[in-house]
């Protein structure tokens, strides 16, 4: 289960973000803050439901670091309280702009894996990833990454592939090699625009092909050329040095193994998400009213 302690709240306003407008689903809860009561209930029940000796907690946003460090320290205390002999691991996704020495010390001391959202070199990243004032965010993200490296925190990158950066696959890939990022996840962005009465503008899957493709969407041809170009470069000299999730997952599928990524699995629905108020959905990309499964308090 991917847990969202701040819901859609974020200090950035990326043009392509599919999650910012989820705040419109919870207008009656303007703060979008997970309570200590819900945190404890979730940790207890989540650990108790596991059948394996290792339990992984995944913290996602919005921007996860908009909750104070004390929240995550509390979470770790509760994990220890309810561990029942299991090994607990944590990973957290962040845009990197709010990272400090204190945050990085906490992550290193407790062996958290940190995922950083960064869309390649500055020109590519700043095309769509801006703050709420419309200012670019690349410099602050790189400051955060350098802090992670300084403190020896294990980290990887999630990079959105859009209509702009998809045109420069080798520049894009070489950037991650230059900043010594050895684990990279590519996330192609494709959205349709449909206006809703509650203020949302992105179409759900239930709406099919209604609406026009958003301008930032990567085209099928762009995505294919992007992957093929990077693969040809990667396979020549970087196998075993740099790990690209989609290549590893494709190989795993080919070998009859578990791909490790839900989009390549035989069945959808193994990567659920819980919102700040306990609402549960089958997927981070299915947070729409019609796909709500229930609430941790009621179902």
Predicted regions and their residues:
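Canonical Radical SAM [4Fe-4S] cluster-binding loop centered on the CxxxCxxC motif
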Residues: 2-37
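Short cysteine clusters
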Residues: 10, 14-17, 262, 268, ...
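Radical SAM enzyme [4Fe-4S]-AdoMet core and its adjacent flexible, acidic
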Residues: 129-139, 146-263, 267, 273-277, ...
């Amino acid at each position: 289960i991917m847990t969202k302690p701040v819901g859609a709240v974020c200090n950035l306003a990326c043009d392509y973000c599919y999650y910012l407008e989820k705040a419109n689903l919870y207008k009656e809860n303007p703060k979008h803050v997970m309570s200590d009561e819900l945190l404890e209930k979730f940790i207890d029940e989540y650990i108790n439901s596991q059948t394996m000796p290792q339990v992984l907690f995944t913290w996602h946003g919005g921007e996860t670091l908009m909750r104070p460090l004390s929240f995550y320290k509390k979470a770790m205390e509760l994990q220890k309280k309810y561990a029942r002999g299991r090994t607990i691991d944590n990973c957290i996704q962040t845009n990197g702009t709010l990272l400090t020495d204190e945050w990085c010390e906490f992550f290193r001391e407790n062996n958290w894996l940190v995922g950083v959202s960064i869309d390649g070199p500055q020109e590519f990243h700043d095309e769509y990833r801006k703050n709420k004032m419309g200012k670019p965010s690349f410099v602050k993200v790189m400051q955060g990454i350098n802090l992670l490296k300084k403190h020896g925190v294990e980290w990887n990158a999630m990079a959105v592939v859009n209509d702009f950066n998809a045109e420069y696959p080798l520049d894009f890939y070489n950037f991650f090699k230059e900043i010594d990022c050895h684990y990279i996840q590519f996330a192609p962005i494709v959205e349709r625009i449909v206006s809703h009465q509650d203020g949302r503008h992105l179409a759900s899957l239930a709406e099919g092909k209604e609406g026009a493709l958003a301008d930032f969407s990567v085209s099928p041809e762009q995505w294919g050329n992007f992957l093929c170009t990077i693969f040809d470069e990667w396979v020549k000299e970087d196998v075993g040095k740099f790990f690209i999730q989609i290549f590893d997952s494709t190989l795993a599928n080919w070998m009859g193994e578990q791909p490790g990524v839900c989009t390549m699995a035989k069945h959808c629905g193994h990567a659920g998400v819980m919102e700040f108020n306990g609402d549960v959905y089958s997927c981070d990309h299915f947070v729409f009213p019609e796909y709500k499964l229930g609430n941790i308090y009621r179902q």
